[in-house]
């Protein structure tokens, strides 16, 4: 009897350890901060539908800076030691350059209306990391030797919201190279930072990933979002679909007119039935299919900006 009870307890303990050992960790991607790139003139202009914006030129960073590869490798090893899977930004950039099959510019085949994405949007779409970590550092010279000051910030790759940060200064010495000085400085401050990352991901795991969703109409369409179908406005159908398909029915309609509806804090599942990550595009495909079927039979265009914003446009494709 005791032997059987002991065997049962061991089996339960083993199962419990296995469950905790398989706890999901967010996938990370490490990049230099915008400010670091600006200070070193690694910037380029991006034409955002007629508006010029300065954005980091990550390709140039990895090609020309002698320290960034080592720095990212050192920080990456610190995060991997804590169980976080990592996406290699440099390799993802090379993959984007190698393919160049499309320029990530989407347009209506009827009217030519378009939506553009920044280089970071394209990189995040390719890598599909959950969290982007940005690093800034500066080398200080003291009587005791060189030291580094650093700022480590983490952003939700889907919403661009800051979710964790850490700052600090390393111990001066004249023997270690900059990447090692930086690694040691970060190690002394990393545990609270890692805890913030895990807390954010745990919230997503329980309450869904946050994305943005916009539903709008083409100007050429003969209906609008207040048009009634079988006694209900199109806007009402959108709300009902979101109630059924978001996690715990959580979303916020921030604005609604006859031409456009904007939803914020739309909580979508992290994974599908096959345990693959779901982004805003995959989620919005369900709404696209919904409106393409009876009783609507609409032409529907699906566009995205980055991983976390989907735009459904009704009336053309």
Regions found by a protein language model. Name each.
Residues 131-175, 305-317:
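Amphipathic beta-strand/beta-sheet edge segments enriched in Tyr/Trp
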Residues 22-42, 161-250, 305-306:
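C-terminal/domain-edge helix-coil "capping" segments
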Residues 286-317:
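C-terminal basic regulatory modules in eukaryotic proteins
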Residues 23-25, 66, 70, 74, ...:
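Extracytoplasmic
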Residues 1-24:
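Bacterial Sec-dependent N-terminal signal peptides
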Residues 92-110, 155-178:
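Short, flexible helix-coil linker/hinge segments at the edges of structured domains or between repeats
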Residues 38-41, 96-99, 142-147, 222-223:
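Extracytoplasmic/secreted cell-surface and envelope-processing proteins
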């Amino acid at each position: 009897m005791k032997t059987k009870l002991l065997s049962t307890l061991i089996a339960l303990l083993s199962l419990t350890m296995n469950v905790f050992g398989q706890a999901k960790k967010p996938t990370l991607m490490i990049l230099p901060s915008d400010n670091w790139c600006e200070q070193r003139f690694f910037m380029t202009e991006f034409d955002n539908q007629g508006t010029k914006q300065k954005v980091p030129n990550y390709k140039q960073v990895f090609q020309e800076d002698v320290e960034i590869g080592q720095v990212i490798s050192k920080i990456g090893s610190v995060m991997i030691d804590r169980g976080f899977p990592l996406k290699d930004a440099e390799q993802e950039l090379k993959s984007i350059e190698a393919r160049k099959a499309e320029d990530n510019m989407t347009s209506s085949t009827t009217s030519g209306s378009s939506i553009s994405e920044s280089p970071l949007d394209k990189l995040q779409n390719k890598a599909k990391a959950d969290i982007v970590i940005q690093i800034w550092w500066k080398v200080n010279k003291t009587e005791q030797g060189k030291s580094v000051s650093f700022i480590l910030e983490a952003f939700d790759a889907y919403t661009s919201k800051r979710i964790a940060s850490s700052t600090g200064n390393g111990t001066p010495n004249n023997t270690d190279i900059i990447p090692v000085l930086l690694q040691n400085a970060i190690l002394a401050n990393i545990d609270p930072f890692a805890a913030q990352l895990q807390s954010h991901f745990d919230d997503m795991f329980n309450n869904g990933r946050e994305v943005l969703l916009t539903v709008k109409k083409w100007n050429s369409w003969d209906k609008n979002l207040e048009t009634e179908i079988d006694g209900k406005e199109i806007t009402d159908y959108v709300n009902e679909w979101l109630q059924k398909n978001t996690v715990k029915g959580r979303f916020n309609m921030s604005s609604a007119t006859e031409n456009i509806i904007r939803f914020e804090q739309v909580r979508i599942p992290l994974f599908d039935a096959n345990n693959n990550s779901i982004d805003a595009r995959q989620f919005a495909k369900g709404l696209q299919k919904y409106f393409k079927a009876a009783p609507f039979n609409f032409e529907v265009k699906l566009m995205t900006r980055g991983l976390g914003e989907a735009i459904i446009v009704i009336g053309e494709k």
